[in-house]
């Protein structure tokens, strides 16, 4: 929690105002932020200085694991995070690749599960990683990559957190996640949960202990219409004790995650927070 608040304060104190062409708004911006999550000791990085909705974050990552390309599928597993980008983004609404309501195109999990090859075949990056790690193999390239410039025009949004690199040292699994851009007030509490969850669940289904997850953010920013709430409300609050995150131990394989797993298989114990803050969202 401290590293989250430290980053927020750093942006306020040291950030540079940058015009964002996509949203038409200014952002207070810093370059390079590194956060570390102690998954091994169960230090769950859920923000307590405002109410945070961890279920939507986990549900979204499960949708990526399943390779979903429809906002409707994400809603069914418990998150509405893709509704706006799939249905309210003018550039995407006028894109000939869009298939209709709720279509997201070839983004995130689609790239992770079916990266297109020139010969018409597809690469399932995630399955390769899970298969390797389950056999104790780390080829120094166990990388789940969502960033495919050749297909940016075929999706509603470029990936923000685009790379997840797993590393095995003995029986302990580590994760390095890289994010090109982060809306810190709205998105970071979400992304912290996702990085923690991804290492925890992959360690479980591959039979390893979870170590630490390292989260690099390149462009960390606060939009101009979020700054007052961050300065006068969230940064004035004292953080509360971190909760505990539990995963159903019966989840033992990638197939389990693809088929029967629901949000009922995850639990957060002892979460207390300050009141919610309604930060503006920029499509």
From Swiss-Prot:
The active site is at residue 160. Pathway: Pyrimidine metabolism; dTTP biosynthesis. GO terms for molecular function: thymidylate synthase activity. It is found in: Cytoplasm. DUMP binds at residues 22, 180-183, 191, 221-223. Keywords: Cytoplasm, Methyltransferase, Nucleotide biosynthesis, Transferase. Its EC number is 2.1.1.45. It is an enzyme of class 2 (transferase). Pfam families: Thymidylat_synt. (6R)-5,10-methylene-5,6,7,8-tetrahydrofolate binds at residues 183, 282. One of its GO terms (cellular component) is cytosol. CDD domains: TS_Pyrimidine_HMase. It catalyses: dUMP + (6R)-5,10-methylene-5,6,7,8-tetrahydrofolate = 7,8-dihydrofolate + dTMP. One of its GO terms (biological process) is methylation. The keyword Ribosomal protein does not apply. Belongs to the thymidylate synthase family. Bacterial-type ThyA subfamily. Homodimer. This is Thymidylate synthase. The gene is thyA.
